[in-house]
């Protein structure tokens, strides 16, 4: 009887947490993102190019910010968050990523746009407050863009990295699962790593509705659709272990440090996604994984100050794993 009572109480606690998240999460995501700066962060003089890359899948040219690491260099694809803008990638708006990686031997690739996309190939048109468009981001990132970059910029098609924050952290992992030759390295910073489970689909739908008016059903169908499982990193740990993919996972504990991010939305969101990261670590270790960095012990909130610090910290690891030759690219 005691065991049953404990289970009932535990179920009740999960229900209350889920209900609270359903009420607060969409608005908090909007607040945590903060107001974007008017201009990008990269200083004048850096060799940053603004490419218009044709996408047959999406029926338009896609803007891509690009800094070369030299001919034949490996690349780091930096993916944006839920509220990705159409002018600059969030990594350039909020961090000096191009400065940090200048002459690192790594080409830096920042696709622009894709609000609420999860960088996925959607089942249906992505219709939001700004109208409808076609989202075939996985096809773009794994076929159209690498072909363009290999032909026009001398970037390697294989042996690259994908790094994402929040929404796109899980996207980076799934890109590595499904395209292991292209992405031998995946970085996930403050992401929800079990999106298909529990209230995940409902909460993601609410957040997408708040961030542009998009519908999760148009992306992956109802929660029972296999696409949700296909895009759930926690269900693909055996593939990541089998491919020996290099992983870099970060999630703070919701307590701000001297870096900043001391606001309730950023603190709540980091706490909210933390448990999925800890579970992922346990499952990864249990599956025999041995090629990952887990940075879960430090203070940190759901904000760019911490994601930028992680990107800067992982640079030597990226260079070593991808075989970069520092000094290239200008």
Curated annotation (Swiss-Prot):
Ranges where the record places region Fibronectin-binding: 98-108
Family label: Belongs to the mycobacterial A85 antigen family.
Signal peptide: 1-40
Function according to Swiss-Prot or TrEMBL: The antigen 85 proteins (FbpA, FbpB, FbpC) are responsible for the high affinity of mycobacteria for fibronectin, a large adhesive glycoprotein, which facilitates the attachment of M.tuberculosis to murine alveolar macrophages (AMs). They also help to maintain the integrity of the cell wall by catalyzing the transfer of mycolic acids to cell wall arabinogalactan and through the synthesis of alpha,alpha-trehalose dimycolate (TDM, cord factor).
Reactions accelerated catalytically: 2 alpha,alpha'-trehalose 6-mycolate = alpha,alpha'-trehalose 6,6'-bismycolate + alpha,alpha-trehalose; an acyl-CoA + a 1,2-diacyl-sn-glycerol = a triacyl-sn-glycerol + CoA
Top-level EC class: transferase
Active-site residues (renumbered): 166 (nucleophile), 270, 302
Gene coding for it: fbpB
Cysteine disulfide partners in this protein: 127-132
Protein name per Swiss-Prot or TrEMBL: Diacylglycerol acyltransferase/mycolyltransferase Ag85B
Binding of substrate, residues: 82-83, 166, 194, 272-275, 279, 302-304
Pfam families recorded: Esterase
GO CC annotation: extracellular region
Stored PANTHER family: DIACYLGLYCEROL ACYLTRANSFERASE_MYCOLYLTRANSFERASE AG85A, ENTEROCHELIN ESTERASE-RELATED
Predominant location: secreted
One MF term in the entry's GO annotations: trehalose O-mycolyltransferase activity
Keywords noted in UniProt: Acyltransferase, Disulfide bond, Secreted, Signal, Transferase
EC number(s) per entry: 2.3.1.122, 2.3.1.20
Biological classification of the source: Bacteria, Bacillati, Actinomycetota, Actinomycetes, Mycobacteriales
Subcellular location: Secreted
